[in-house]
A protein has these predicted regions:
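Cell-envelope/extracellular polymer assembly enzymes that use nucleotide-activated donors
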Residues: 55
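Surface-exposed interaction regions that form or flank ligand-binding interfaces
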Residues: 1-52, 89-177
Length: 177
């Protein structure tokens, strides 16, 4: 392999390792929370041509949390239109780039969970009840696992502020809900 290919491969490997580190940090927080819960980690859900890789599905006595973990480098900004931007330095140069909304990504995960369950419930009353109460009992959280991240949230959407949190806020957020 060429030097450029080796550098790209090392970079991709480092990103994977950082992602794993972030998920381990979140798992540690969950396991040491003192809250009764079931923790399902790294779930792949498929329904026809749709699929989702869910980082954590956490079942507590009150709610079910679908958690998307992100271990990103740099400072994270959420603009007034709910766009996600990260800023970091790369070889002395400041880089500012947008990235796909993890909130939107996690909403897709929730929608797939909803659809899979609805497709497997045969009783009309159970389907109606599940559909009606789904958004009350299934909650989306995006957890930024890198402790060095600074979050600047300019979103006018209150839900965004409640859904995008740092790893050190995870347990207090779960307890409040």
């Amino acid at each position: 392999a060429s030097e450029l290919e080796k550098i790209k491969l090392k970079s991709q490997l480092k990103l994977l390792q950082e992602g794993e580190t972030g998920e381990k940090n979140i798992l540690f927080e969950l396991k040491n929370s003192g809250i009764d819960m079931y923790i399902l980690h790294d779930i792949r859900l498929e329904d026809g041509d749709r699929s989702a890789q869910i980082d954590f599905l956490v079942v507590t006595r009150k709610l079910i949390f679908v958690i998307e973990s992100k271990h990103l480098i740099g400072d994270i900004e959420i603009d007034e239109n709910n766009g996600f931007i990260r800023s970091y330095e790369y070889y002395g140069k400041k880089v500012r780039e947008g990235f796909y909304s993890p909130v939107t990504q996690n909403q897709r995960h929730l929608q797939l969970i909803h659809d899979v369950v609805m497709n497997h419930k045969k009783n009309a009353i159970m389907r109606l009840a599940f559909d009606h109460w789904f958004s009350d009992y299934y909650q989306s959280l995006v957890v930024l696992a890198n402790p060095k991240n600074c979050i600047r949230n300019y979103s006018k959407d209150k839900q965004i502020s409640q859904q995008v949190i740092r790893a050190d806020q995870l347990i207090s957020t779960i307890k409040k809900m």
